[in-house]
Amino acid sequence: MVKSYAPIQTYEAKQLSYDLLNNPKDFYKHNRRYATSFVLNVTYGKRAPIWECKEIADIYGCLSRFGRVRRPGSFIVDTFPSLANNPIYNMFSDWRRVGEDTFKKDSEVFMGFWNDTKERVKDGSAPHCFGKVFVQSDFEDQGLDELTCAYTWYTLPPRPVLSVSISDSFSGGFLEGGSETTSLTMNNCIVGMLSNPSVIQKAHEELDRVVGSSRTPTFEDEPNLPYLRQIIKETLRWRPINKLGANHYATQDDWYEGFFIPKGSIVMVNWWALHYDEKRWRDPEKFDPDRMEGRTMSAAEEAASGDPMDRSHFSYGGGRRICPGTFPQLYHLHSHPRAPPGSLSLLHFQNSANFLQGMHIAERSLFLNLSRLLWGFNIEHDKDSQGNIIPVDYTLETGIMPGGFTVPKPFAARITVRSPERAKILRQQWEVAQKTGVDFSDITFDKVGNVKM
């Protein structure tokens, strides 16, 4: 299932490399465009060929609103729900207005994608994508309305066994979350490598030895590029994707190391304490992929292990609210917290063939783009007109954007192609890709997402 997305990932990665050749100063935006275009392709069979397009503006508008409501301490009512009915608190807090405004604006975006997909399914122009399968499914028989489907963006499992109540997960699920998580990890990786330039040199040496200079890296090279995998693991340890992760809910009274946890308590995984534990990680604030040497399991294999010490990081979460993809018996249908009562948010199903393996897909995108970036380019600190190095803020205190995700503030870097020969290969790859389009599940569509008849 995961490998079926390879043509789309490869296609978008080729444009990313081409964009870096032509306009390297905008690498921050290029990484964001890649991630958004890929998930748009998978979910709705549409591309985001440039950063300045309506689809990206709509999605990042949703992300901005999500960041506001998800920012730690934004609304105390999240910690003390009883305040929702307190008239004095409601006089001075705009939490309800913000929530209703967010739901209204997000719904307009998501229903826009949903209705566009319905029209393309009707006229036969919709390529193979999850949105198409969802539109053609019997979602109404499953108790789902169109608004819930628009927030969900996953295929329905064939035989639902058990439904559970609405979860307070990411609104828009895969599309909204997938747009930012991959790009912020790539940009955090660049920040980390700038803080420790020896990492770039080691990666260049490994890629030159394994891949050479006459071709670009492919997914098949991954087992032979352990240092690249170490860089990805260290990035996710050094800068977790989400600042606080998903809330967990205690379904019964429990005790942990002498602490009583009442039923109904909100419990969160403190991955900052785990990732920066000096007993486990020497000099944890340093970006150092060498510490991941010998950790050969994939992120999903680590997460599925019964031993938490097997995990190199907890950026994908843990427990029943872990990132989709680890446990195939769980199928997440994320609905908005204000979706109509009774709409499904989590379905357990028997056939795992339709499971959207988000964690695996993210890992493959990170590997492909990082390997192509380091194969083709040098990465250095940028300099101003006087020749002075432009500093990059490596700190957590001031180097991260406000909001729920660990997004680095925009920063300067000097990205240059490693040789004219490599530039020629990267340029030719994108020229060919534009002519041939994307071949995905026996359906070929062009560079803007239209089906090629």
Where are these regions (language model features)?
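Conserved cytochrome P450 K-helix/beta-meander segment immediately N-terminal to the heme-binding cysteine loop
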Residues: 269-304, 339, 430-431
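Hydrophobic, well-ordered secondary-structure elements that form the walls
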Residues: 203, 235, 261-264, 287, ...
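Cytochrome P450 heme-thiolate monooxygenase catalytic core
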Residues: 2-186
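Cytochrome P450 catalytic-core helices
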Residues: 181-199, 204-206, 327-333, 360-376
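Conserved beta-strand elements of beta-rich interaction domains across eukaryotes
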Residues: 266, 273-274, 320-321, 336-338, ...
